[in-house]
Amino acid sequence: MEPEWTIISLLKWTESYFNSHGIDSPRMTAEILLAHTLKTTRINLYIQHDKPLSCSELIQFKTLIQRRINREPVAYITGSKEFWSLDFTVTRDVLIPRPDTECIVEATLALLPNQHSDQPKKILDLGTGSGAIIIALASERPHNVYFATDRSSAAAILARKNAAKHGLSDTIHFLCSNWFDAINPNKHSFDIIVSNPPYIPTDIIPTLAPEINRYEPRIALDGDHDGLSDIRKILHSAPDYLLNGGYLLLEIGFDQMNSVFKIAGNSSFYNCIEFIKDYAGHHRVLKLKKN
């Protein structure tokens, strides 16, 4: 007779199994996947720790374990990722939102009035992916006008769904567009433009963790030979879409500050070049003000 698997015994076994296979945060990963399987919360796993799993639940959980052993990111397995204390649906069509990217949200919110204004600001998010940045901004300052673009139609559709999930469908305008292509500068000028563009050098991508180089969309990672191709494009084009005195905020690689400073410094359109550090102390966000 096979032993009965309870929640707590399964958590202990899975933690050990993940640990032996070099999976990061083995206990937390086991909790997240088991809670997802049972459609409950991680806290409830411990409240119901002696509850046995059914055969179908065990089969489903074992499938999720194997996916994680194959180094598929937890966010893709569960289809969900928290960002800015909001829950986002994620698929392999979009980059998984990272905590470091919350720095660009913080820096942008500092530029936006907290109270309702008779003259709402216009904000544009380039390469929106799951919509994490623009939705986080709109959730905090819903009285402004928001636009977001992505070259991937699948990403744009997913971002719209995430906006609807958070009641922001009427607040954010999503466009399928390669950077600025679908935006007419004669009709739209923005107070703030934000972006988390691809900035990883092409030859570095194969050296990244399997969770990244096997599963996340290459189009959202690959910044060409030096990682700066899309950053250059945005820096070059943004002045045509920014109001005078408007701001451009870009996420950059942790080691790209000097290179990005040279590119930005060669433009006559910007002043007040500033770099903002992430939670690990790396210069993560470039902040520019248009003359």
Map each language-model feature to its residues.
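Conserved AdoMet
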Residues: 34-111
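Helix-to-beta-strand junctions that scaffold the AdoMet/dcAdoMet cofactor pocket
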Residues: 168, 216, 242-244
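Residue-level signal for inorganic ion chemistry
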Residues: 33, 71, 101, 133, ...
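Conserved SAM/SAH cofactor-binding pocket of Class I
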Residues: 103-207
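Mobile active-site "lid"/loop adjacent to the S-adenosyl-L-methionine
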Residues: 199-230
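Non-catalytic accessory regions of SAM-dependent methyltransferases
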Residues: 1-38, 43-46, 50
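Conserved hydrophobic residues forming the short capping helix/wall of the S-adenosyl-L-methionine
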Residues: 18, 112, 163, 238, ...
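Conserved Class I SAM-dependent methyltransferase catalytic core
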Residues: 225-288
